[in-house]
Structure formats: C-alpha cells, structure tokens
Amino acid sequence: VLRETLQLLADTACKQPQRFLLLYTAAGEPDALAAPPWRLDGAIQFFTRANDFGFSKHPNETFRIWDRTQILSDVVRVIRTFRPQVLITRFSPEPGTTHGHHTASAQLALEAFQKAGDPSAFPEQLADGRLLPWSPTRVLWNSFPAAFRGGNRKAGDTAPATLQMDSGVYNPLLGESFGEIAA
C-alpha cells in the first residue's frame, strides 16, 4: 500500500517525480519492523522519541505520555532533512476516528507542516547551517472510502477534498500494475 500511494501520487497528481514523506505510527503494529516499508518502495524509515506505551483512546491521553514539543521537533527535523514536497499522513487528525497514537501522529504532522519552514521554530536545528527551513507544498491524508461512512460522522459533515486514483492501472515505467506491485 505504501508503494502504491507513493507511485500513484507521483504519476497522477503531480505529473513529475516528487519526494513524499509518509507519517504514521508503528505503535502496536509489530509487523512494522519485520517487513520494513523500504523493501516495497525504497523509502527511508525514521523514528521519533515517542514511547510505544500501549493502546490509547484519545490524542490527549497520548500527549500526557509523549513530550509533544520533543516529538514535534523530531518530525520537523525529518522534514528539514528529507525535504519532501508532500506530506502524507496515514490517519485523520480528528479525535475519535482512530487510536490516540494515530491521531496524535496526524496532529503532529500538521503542526510540523506549519513549523518546518519557519526559521524561528526549533532554531537549534539550523544553528550549524546543515539544515535549512523547508516548507512542503501540501499535506495529504492516505485514507480509504470507509473512513467517510457512518461511525464518527455528524449530520451535515462532508468528506474533505479528495484525490482518488485507480490503483489497478498499469505503470509502463515499472512494468507492472500497482496491484501487482502491492501483492
């Protein structure tokens, strides 16, 4: 799924090669290290100082354990180092739609999106001149249609602007369909 998302966005949405940074938590997901994403898509995996402390129902609960400023600093550093054009969060930043860890990671991604280009945010990262402020162009939420049905939606809610891509199409550059790549 990670490779599918990256390649589709590069081919369909942007019409040129782009650098993407997917932000998600591996908390409670033991397979995250057993089958690293870069084996599928060539991505580099970064870790923050966030503790995996078990199940959390709300991001406020997560941030009582995680040092929000410290973790935000880590995410900003990754953005400034990697310099992606687009950030992709795996989960919604809205509380109640998923686990607290996941929601917290999406909230941190949105905050980092704003702060990474601001030289007054975490200036110690810029002090030696090796890192510079960097502003990705946009943030996308890698979701699925079921996320917009029932459950946590309120009357009158509308789905956010969406970019849909057919993952079953053949990619001539890769010589396979995206479904074949993901299989």
Question: PLM ranges: what are they?
Answer:
Residues 1-123:
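Active-site beta-strand->loop->alpha-helix modules in alpha/beta enzyme cores, enriched
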Residues 115-183:
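The feature marks non-catalytic terminal segments
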